[in-house]
Amino acid sequence: MAVTKIYIVYYSLHGHVETMAREVLRGVNSVPDVEATLWQVPETLPEKILEKVKAVPRPDDVPDIRPEQLAEADGFMFGFPSRFGVMASQVMTFFDNTNDLWTTQALAGKPAGIFWSTGFHGGGQELTALTAVTKLAHHGMIFVPVGYTFGKSMYEMGEVKGGSPYGSGTYAADGSREPTELEIQQANYHGKYFAGIAKKLKKRSPV
């Protein structure tokens, strides 16, 4: 059986989304005949600003991705922090540079999922996801939400938990809060669930 290639493309300023991305990677790679690759969205902020906001160093083992490289994959998981209810400007800029792919609809019919980090309740856990879907729609990609398939943990009220039916998520608070065990579990499940859907779509594709 042909391998289904999933690109996990993320941007992380303080490390929270990176943590989620690596767990999504484990989930995707747990599905037979599916292979995931981690990619970073290029940074757009100058070093002086990054130092001021105490950005964590970018990992050396995850290369930056160029827009045209998206065409190589069978599906995508995009991860990003929220800024004022939308994806961070670095990810916005990356999508703005996919015009050539949009012109040819090179990504049409390919599945895509999303995961994210916000500061607090009301910081965009669902709004960020909803606004991100517009990028996928204009490319003709198939949005794959996680729904409530994660089970009873989706209804957890005993602790703070990010994520929603749109995808997995976490809260960063002032930057000191790290993804919880439950959020990590959901990210892993999300990757596994998405990989299963992407694999089915590739198998049924006439191309």
From Swiss-Prot:
Keywords: Flavoprotein, FMN, NAD, NADP, Nucleotide-binding, Oxidoreductase. SUPFAM superfamilies: Flavoproteins. Its cofactor is FMN. FMN binds at residues 12-16, 114-167. Binds 1 FMN per monomer. It catalyses: a quinone + NADH + H(+) = a quinol + NAD(+); a quinone + NADPH + H(+) = a quinol + NADP(+). One of its GO terms (cellular component) is plastid. This is Probable NAD(P)H dehydrogenase (quinone) FQR1-like 3. It comes from Arabidopsis thaliana. The lineage of its organism: Eukaryota, Viridiplantae, Streptophyta, Embryophyta, Tracheophyta.
